[in-house]
From Swiss-Prot:
GO cellular component: cytosol
Name of this chain's protein: Cold shock-like protein CspB
Organism the protein comes from: Escherichia coli (strain K12)
Domain of life: Bacteria
Xref: CDD domains: CSP_CDS
PROSITE patterns (alphabetical): CSD_1, CSD_2
InterPro entries attached to this UniProt entry: Cold_shock_CspA (IPR012156), Cold_shock_domain (IPR050181), CSD (IPR011129), CSD_CS (IPR019844), CSP_DNA-bd (IPR002059), NA-bd_OB-fold (IPR012340)
Length: 71
């Protein structure tokens, strides 16, 4: 499952370093950890941001990987 997907950040807690992305195709929300964010600066996301990502199998189920902010 390495296909690129597009989604909108549903919520992200910068203090805890995780949140969820809602894929635009209507599939189930995907967990995202700050370490998956591809950014040289502070790795955080904001509600409503458009992102592209792939999905990997995490320890507790599907998780976003290679998250790139596109807006």
């Amino acid at each position: 499952m390495s296909n690129k997907m597009t989604g909108l950040v549903k919520w992200f807690n910068a203090d805890k370093g995780f949140g969820f992305i809602s894929p635009v195709d209507g599939s189930k929300d995907v967990f995202v950890h700050f370490s998956a964010i591809q950014n040289d600066n502070y790795r955080t996301l904001f509600e409503g941001q458009k992102v592209t990502f792939s999905i990997e199998s995490g320890a507790k189920g599907p998780a976003a990987a290679n998250v790139i902010i596109t807006d």
